[in-house]
Amino acid sequence: MRKFLKSAIEYLAKDLDLDKELLEQIQYVVIVLTFEFIKCISVILIAGILGYFKESLIVILSMCFIKPFIGGYHEDSQLKCFIATLIITTSIIMLVTFNKLNLFSIVILNLFSIFSIYNKAPVIDSRFPLTKEHLIKKNKILSVTNSSILFLITLIFFKISWISQTITWTLLIQTLLLFNKYKREDS
């Protein structure tokens, strides 16, 4: 599929007179977005077959809203990434199913997540280096803003507990996964 996408982009771009660097960037973005789309749809379909369509949809949408900006956990292949996403989504759905959070718990967990994201995001992965200072700052602002928006959504939808709790657990788990790649400065 990767070769097909690269060839298709090269074919479409040959009349646009793009330089090699821009063409590579376009290819990278299209390939990543295509694989991410397939992964997300697959996870939602599997969860839907098991009766958790709406929960998995909220998990995936919440992840898409914050994950690109906070960094953190990455796998080294599409299959491993799919399996990890499926396990994370299933775990969040189980947490929502078996643990009921009150308003105080939701506020505390979300504030903890936002505080951690503010202090650690974006976590830079060596395979996906973000080296330009202005991009790092932009991602930090977007990660804090988006996690704060998710927190507000949990408060607005508190009476619809499965939405509020699904977003809260997703934000918390994604925040915990930030520390998977965090390296202490003295190590």
Curated annotation (Swiss-Prot):
It is a multi-pass membrane protein. The keyword Cell membrane applies. Keywords: Cell membrane, Hydrolase, Membrane, Protease, Quorum sensing, Transmembrane, Transmembrane helix. It is an enzyme of class 3 (hydrolase). It is found in: Cell membrane. May be involved in the proteolytic processing of a quorum sensing system signal molecule precursor. GO terms for molecular function: peptidase activity. It holds the Pfam family AgrB. GO terms for biological process: proteolysis; quorum sensing. Belongs to the AgrB family. The keyword Nucleotide-binding does not apply. One of its GO terms (cellular component) is plasma membrane. The chain crosses the membrane at residues 29-49, 50-70, 81-98, 103-120, 149-169. Its main location: membrane. Coiled coil: none annotated. It comes from Clostridium perfringens (strain 13 / Type A). This is Putative AgrB-like protein 1. HAMAP family: AgrB.
